[in-house]
């Protein structure tokens, strides 16, 4: 009993001592202790056992009263992840040394194929960041003397990759000036009651813009990526962060997967469409009244695809933020707070309108798309809307430029060295040996054309290398010429969302940092199957109705 009384007196004395020197004592309290005040009582909320020792053992030396530092965290592993590294290297070595080289393929071509597969597997498994691993693949191609230095780096002069980089800088301008936030707020005001409605609005808006902007790359980089980033950030969804799944990653995936259908619906919606038409004419397939014919054949399956794709991704890759019934009213109030458009927003809007005009009419006056983008960026730099430090600090732009150039260069050399032609010959011989009907040959060749795109980093390059031989094989198998020519062209558009390197928009959207690499491959493959079912199922009935077969 005496012991209990003494302990109570000690605790009371300690409390009074603390109460008299509260300012000094609270300055020494560890962060885990919070002080709550009521009108009649000041109490201590204790969540750390060290406070009890400090309150009752005030006679201990001052060093012992100091809060102890947290234990050091274990060091992060340095360098490449060993298991993904070992798997990637093993794939390259197995192809190079254990699988017999076909007679039709040169030693240089086979060695490049092994390095390409080594690079692609590393991009999927992720032993290092994407740009770093692509650079290692590039180095391997030079060290092994598979490619000379000038050839390995030749793709860094490719117009497409610089158009991608400049599009990132445009997106930076939209965000810096606040124009992207303003446009995004209007989208929320009109369509923002649900995330799904927002994705439908963006998808159909891109389809309509295909009438005036004949480049999926230009639409993605100049318009929709800045808007999506502004929408995501305004919702608290940030790249490279767990919050990316809140909104940004869903909108990125939806817009990328819808870009295939929006690029296929019109002859002028994508740059490679006109190339396919030209190549079909060289093979002997002439399409009369091409603009109208193209739209009639593509319209129904493309429209069904645009209706289904956002909903399927909503189930497959759902956003955390789904319903926002209060968002339109909040967006209207935000627009009032933003006030009138600022000077820099007008400059940004004017520069982009001028750039888009050059994208639309530039070909007629001899100005390429990348040159139009360079003129627009130069205008923004000269007028100070963005500065060079803004461009230098955009890591996504330079990272995308690096790895995409590496893959474009390797894929182009696979074509030049005969590897792609060998694959086409293998498919042709397989079909001949099976003696299939023309519908079966049509399905197999379309599937092969789609899947072989994993070896290409450019839809235009894919069409230039494989469109003529695959069209010729289908015609030889008895497939109606117009049906084969148009379906291969539609297929060429849909293949652009297979992976992060499948085309300019894919590289751009992946570079925004909202989607993990594995999710890019997973969603890309699943949606490729979905698109094949939609276009093959709905399309076959529609094309029969049109009399294509």
Swiss-Prot record:
Source organism's superkingdom? Eukaryota
Recorded GO cellular component terms are: chloroplast inner membrane; plastid
| Keyword tags | Chloroplast, Membrane, Plastid, Plastid inner membrane, Transit peptide, Transmembrane, Transmembrane helix, Transport
Transit peptide feature range: 1-54
**Where is the sequence biased in composition, kind Pro residues?**
67-77
Q: Where are the transmembrane segments?
A: 79-99, 115-135, 151-171, 220-240, 247-267, 294-314, 344-364, 365-385, 403-423, 436-456, 470-490, 523-543
Query: Which stretches does the entry tag as region Disordered?
Result: 57-79
- Tissue-by-tissue expression: Expressed in roots, rosette and cauline leaves, stems, flowers and siliques.
The entry's localization annotation reads: Plastid, Chloroplast inner membrane
Return the PANTHER family for the record. DICARBOXYLATE TRANSPORTER 2.1, CHLOROPLASTIC
Q: What is the role of the protein in this entry?
A: May be involved in the transport of dicarboxylate compounds.
State the name under which the record lists this protein: Dicarboxylate transporter 2.2, chloroplastic
């Amino acid at each position: 009993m005496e012991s209990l009384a003494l302990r109570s007196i000690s605790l009371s004395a300690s409390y009074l001592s603390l109460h008299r020197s509260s300012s000094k004592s609270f300055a020494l309290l560890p962060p885990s202790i919070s002080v709550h005040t009521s009108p009649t009582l000041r109490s201590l909320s204790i969540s750390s056992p060290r406070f009890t020792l400090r309150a009752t053992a005030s006679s201990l030396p001052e060093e012992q009263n100091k809060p102890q530092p947290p234990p050091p965290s274990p060091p992060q592993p340095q360098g490449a992840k060993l298991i993904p590294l070992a798997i990637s290297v093993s794939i390259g070595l197995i192809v190079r040394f254990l699988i017999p080289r076909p007679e039709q393929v040169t030693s240089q071509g086979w060695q490049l194929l092994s390095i390409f597969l080594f690079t692609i597997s590393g991009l999927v498994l992720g032993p290092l960041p994407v740009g770093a691993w692509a650079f290692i693949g590039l180095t391997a191609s030079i060290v092994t003397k598979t490619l000379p230095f000038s050839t390995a780096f030749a793709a860094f002069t490719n117009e497409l990759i610089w158009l991608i980089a400049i599009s990132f800088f445009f997106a930076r301008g939209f965000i810096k000036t606040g124009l992207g936030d303003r446009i995004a707020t209007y989208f929320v005001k009109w369509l923002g009651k649900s995330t799904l409605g927002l994705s439908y609005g963006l998808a159909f808006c891109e389809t309509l813009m295909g009438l005036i902007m004949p480049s999926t790359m230009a639409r993605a980089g100049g318009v929709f990526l800045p808007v999506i980033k502004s929408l995501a950030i305004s919702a608290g969804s940030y790249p490279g962060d767990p919050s990316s799944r809140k909104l940004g990653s869903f909108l990125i995936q939806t817009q990328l997967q819808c870009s295939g259908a929006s690029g296929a619906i019109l002859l002028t919606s994508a740059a490679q469409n006109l190339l396919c038409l030209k190549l079909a004419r060289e093979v002997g397939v002439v399409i009369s009244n091409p603009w109208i014919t193209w739209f009639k054949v593509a319209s129904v399956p493309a429209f069904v695809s645009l209706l289904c794709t956002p909903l399927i991704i909503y189930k497959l890759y759902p956003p955390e933020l789904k319903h926002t019934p209060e968002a339109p009213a909040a967006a209207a109030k935000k627009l009032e707070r933003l006030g009138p458009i600022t000077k820099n927003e007008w400059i940004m809007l004017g520069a982009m309108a001028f750039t888009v005009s050059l994208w639309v009419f530039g070909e007629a006056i001899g100005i390429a798309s990348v040159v139009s983008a360079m003129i627009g960026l130069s205008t923004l730099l000269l007028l100070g809307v963005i500065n060079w430090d803004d461009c230098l600090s955009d890591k996504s732009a330079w990272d995308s430029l690096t790895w995409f150039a590496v893959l474009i260069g390797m894929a182009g050399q696979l074509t030049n060295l005969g590897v792609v032609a060998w694959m086409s010959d293998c498919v042709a011989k397989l079909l001949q040996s099976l003696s299939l009907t023309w519908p079966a040959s049509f399905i197999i060749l379309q599937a092969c054309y789609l899947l072989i795109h994993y070896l290409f980093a450019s839809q235009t390059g894919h069409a230039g290398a494989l469109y003529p031989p695959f069209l010729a094989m289908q015609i030889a198998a008895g497939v109606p010429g117009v049906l084969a020519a148009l379906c291969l062209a539609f297929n060429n558009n849909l293949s652009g969302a297979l992976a992060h390197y499948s085309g300019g928009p894919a590289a751009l959207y992946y570079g925004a940092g909202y989607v993990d690499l594995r999710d890019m491959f997973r969603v890309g493959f699943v949606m490729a199957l979905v698109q094949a079912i939609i276009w093959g199922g709905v399309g076959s009935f529609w094309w029969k109705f049109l009399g294509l077969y």
